[in-house]
Amino acid sequence: MVRHFKMQIFGDRQPGYDGKRNMYTAHPLPIGRDRVDMEVTLPGEGKDQTFKVSIQWVSVVSLQLLLEALAGHLNEVPEDSVQALDVITRHLPSMRYTPVGRSFFSPPEGYYHPLGGGREVWFGFHQSVRPAMWNMMLNIDVSATAFYRAQPIIEFMCEVLDIQNINEQTKPLTDSQRVKFTKEIRGLKVEVTHCGQMKRKYRVCNVTRRPASHQTFPLQLENGQAMECTVAQYFKQKYSLQLKYPHLPCLQVGQEQKHTYLPLEVCNIVAGQRCIKKLTDNQTSTMIKATARSAPDRQEEISRLVKSNSMVGGPDPYLKEFGIVVHNEMTELTGRVLPAPMLQYGGRNKTVATPNQGVWDMRGKQFYAGIEIKVWAVACFAPQKQCREDLLKSFTDQLRKISKDAGMPIQGQPCFCKYAQGADSVEPMFKHLKLTYVGLQLIVVILPGKTPVYAEVKRVGDTLLGMATQCVQVKNVVKTSPQTLSNLCLKINAKLGGINNVLVPHQRPSVFQQPVIFLGADVTHPPAGDGKKPSIAAVVGSMDGHPSRYCATVRVQTSRQETSQELLYSQEVIQDLTNMVRELLIQFYKSTRFKPTRIIYYRGGVSEGQMKQVAWPELIAIRKACISLEEDYRPGITYIVVQKRHHTRLFCADKTERVGKSGNVPAGTTVDSTITHPSEFDFYLCSHAGIQGTSRPSHYQVLWDDNCFTADELQLLTYQLCHTYVRCTRSVSIPAPAYYARLVAFRARYHLVDKDHDSAEGSHVSGQSNGRDPQALAKAVQIHHDTQHTMYFA
């Protein structure tokens, strides 16, 4: 459009365009405030396409207000100014690369990282404009995502179905093969190869049940009549093409009711299609290996990216037009490393552990409050030839020894130790155990790799019978280690009501001087493209003064009829938060005999654009929960959003301060200046020791604070809570309550799994669970009353 109407309208201007409906110019266009309609012709598939475009002046974006906000003179940063700068800086990359969200990708050149299943890794970069103290910042980071490989459909099918040689596939696909293939290819764009240069593109809507040799469609004859013709016959008559694989199915493309069929062998996957479907575990593992970079390597890669002419640092006419200058150097700033809290253990010695770089050792220490296990059972779902009786006996003996050392003695042999097969045997076996063995405290379940048995064990144990279960992979039974057994004990002790360790009281922040409850909340959504599964909301609350024990509440989020934007917010806001918080406050009072005077609420899973729209209704809901208990009950609320999905990375300016094999910043590194918001209360905290790749600091945004925390107090409190996660002897990347809320929401996904489908992915949701029957959904995630007040999710 700009090229077509250069003389009449645009002249030498270089407008920035957001790809949707907004165009920005540095100076007014010579059209006044009138609407101008124009036509633009672009080359299409087979023929040119003409588009009607209207442009009209909307408003002036003031950069003066933005400068005042950056200097701290205004409380609100004008969003329209930030959006305009973002669009302008993204305009050139959008034309050069394939945009995905806020990142840009280009096809692999000089590297190839296959993920299997027709998918591959594309590398690129993330770019966004962010307000900071005194300046606007350009956030650049290396990025990677999965794309579908441009290849013939026959090859794609072979990858998806693990067919080594297509010539050996002489029979039609089985039903299960066809279903798997359909699931992968539905929604993808393909282009045809049998029409010469005219590579027409189509979107796949289905895969036919019948092969091309038998799949028929009504062919219109010249006399106006129609006759049934097979796809194979049609291609032979029309294109003189004898199909090589007439026994394979066809792709149904376009609209389903139009019956357009294409043989697999005349189709290719169109290049540049991002994979939005969930990666398999193997693909995720391959992706992590392909993308993990040590901190110094990532730093070098980002610097190279910025300085290279091919990316953001090159001559950009759009930046020049608007007078925008981007400095090539990374921002240098001063951070500080917070002191790690000491952790109190129990037993006779009452030992104290001092973390070193986010890690401490439990050897020679006993749990602060260990549980004695007198009645326990073992159910082995791995086949006997894979897990022999002598190996099982050795495992249980070693577990008992380690548990005794840890101060959680497992007394005697298991009362029951039997082999079992398949998810269907879980419920009858567990019912038998509950009836037969009075006071049964724990069932240890041995699993044969990834299996639907896990989901069924958790459904029956957590929701149906109220029994504590601990699953162990068979590989860890056959070849066990003290570390694995010790980690099992951490989980078992917490599940049964024990306390692994506590923060040393005299080192805790002053917020602990009065009763305080820590809440963690999260909402998990189904993978993209899976409209059948519901979103799940979870809220957990601390139940003691340490804080160590937590209780959980969980709900299925029902979707209402809204616009897409309203739906986005309604699915993210926790709908029944008032009742969930009320339950936790009542339970806190029952556990401690105190009413909390402060509520510290850590909220995970909220994106930057949704923060305020989610925070206000949730704050009101928390306040309502308090008032519903007593009219005058008004504890101070602090509402903190915890974000991990961002692209800010911290690197040590001084190489001597790098830590570990990956050269990351030390655990406890905190930044609350220079790159933080000019007027809002936020900070970055890297609370964990990076094991692989570059550590990602968590970003904390304080949206409401009745409790008047100083930045130092809240940073230290948050860091200490990262050391209270029961599953490991390491500080974790987000505070324990926020982490537990995620675990609870993910566990509820397993409670919804349909055991009648052999789903190793846990991907099938039972028939009533597709959003049509909210009552059945609510019942499916309802925890049994015997388990409700335990840390079943640990």
From Swiss-Prot:
Residues 758-779 are annotated as: Disordered. GO terms for cellular component: cytoplasm; cytoplasmic ribonucleoprotein granule; nucleus; P-body; RISC complex. The keyword RNA-binding applies. One of its GO terms (biological process) is mRNA catabolic process. PROSITE patterns: PAZ (PS50821), PIWI (PS50822). It is found in: Cytoplasm, P-body. One of its GO terms (molecular function) is RNA endonuclease activity. This is Protein argonaute-4.
